[in-house]
Amino acid sequence: MARISLVGRSAASGAAREAFERKIAERGNIPRMYRVFAHRPWLLTTMDAHFAAVMGSGTVPLRTKELLALQTSQENATRYCIASHTILAERCGATKDQIDALRDVERGPFTDKERAALRFGLQMTRDANRVPDAVLEELRCHYSEAEIVEIAAVVGLFAYFNRFNNAFGLDPTEPGEGVDT
C-alpha cells in the first residue's frame, strides 16, 4: 500500500495532466510513480523527459536497456519496476530464462555483448565504487564509450526510480488504473 497519496487524473493540471493523458494513450493507465510525482508537476516533467531520453534514444538496443532496468530493479527488490519492466523486456524479446538469470548472468543464455553489459550493470548496482577494471574493459570490447554512458544511465536511472518507489511502498500499477480518478 502506498505511503503517499496518488494524484488523481481529475486533480492534475498543466504538465501533470499532459503527462497523464500521454501515459493513458501509450499504456492505458497512469503509472503510480507518475501519480506521486504529480505532487510536483515540474519534477514529473523532468523525470518523464529523462526517462524518455535514457530509454528511447541512443544506439544500445532497447532490449538490452530493458534487461538492465529489470536487473537493477531485481537487485533492489522493487516490485513496482519488476512488474512493469518484466512485461517490457518480454515485449522486446527477452525470454523467461534470461529474465530469471539476470542476477546470475554467468548462467544465463545471453550473448557475450549482453553479458558484458549485464555484468557491468550488476556491479554498478551492487557497489558503483568498486566496479572492477576488468568488467569495464570487457564492456569496452563490445560498446563505444558513448554506449557505455547509455548503459550507466539506465542503471543510474533505475537506481533512482527503485529507491523512490520503494520508499513510498508503491505497488505495481494495474491495467486501466488511474483513468477514472
PLM features per residue range, with description:
Residues 1-181:
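Hydrophobic alpha-helical segments
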